[in-house]
Amino acid sequence: KYVEYLISTPINYTCTNLADHLDGEISHDAINDYLRRENHTPHTIWELAKPLINNSKEAYLIVDDSIQNKQYSQKIELVKLQYSGNTHSLVRGIGIVNLVHAHQNDYNPIDYRVYAPSVDGKTKNEHLRDLLRLAFEEKNIQAQTILFDSWYAASENLKYIHRLGKFFVTTLKENRLVSLSKE
């Protein structure tokens, strides 16, 4: 139920909010205990999502990053100051690069990476390429089209997607030049 809650809740991810929506079925303390006890890795997210997706060529992959706001946290090591597209400002939080499988009205997260360059030295663009490589090579995802915002519209990413034989849909920043020739 917790994964379903995360998928359907765009704003308030608290244990208390989930418990309120379960009409007393589960207490917020039980949810908190579960989250402290369990270790949800990208692999476990995939195992939960795999039976739910319609793995067809008509599906899409969506790459999007989000920041889990931790403005009051002083001791969580992954918290850093970073730009939030939601607030259009810098916020203290944990950056996550998400990969979502979309088919018709079904949206299922299938992978994610924590954006922590001080830990793994990777950029968000490198995470995008890693997520896509795993999706197509190891998870055997059949989607042909990848959607992402202009943050990921770097030449290296676009060429990588092209080499995969896939299509992309994105917006480009004003200062980007595009060539329609095959050069």
How would you label these PLM feature ranges?
Residues 17, 60-63, 109-111, 147, ...:
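A structural signal for short, well-ordered beta-strand segments and their strand-loop junctions
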Residues 29-33, 84-142:
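Electropositive, glycine- and tryptophan-enriched low-complexity nucleic-acid-binding patches
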Residues 35-106:
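Active-site-proximal, Lys/Arg-enriched surface segment
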Residues 71-77, 109-112, 158-159, 180-181:
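Short, conserved acidic/polar surface loops in the N-terminal third of protein domains
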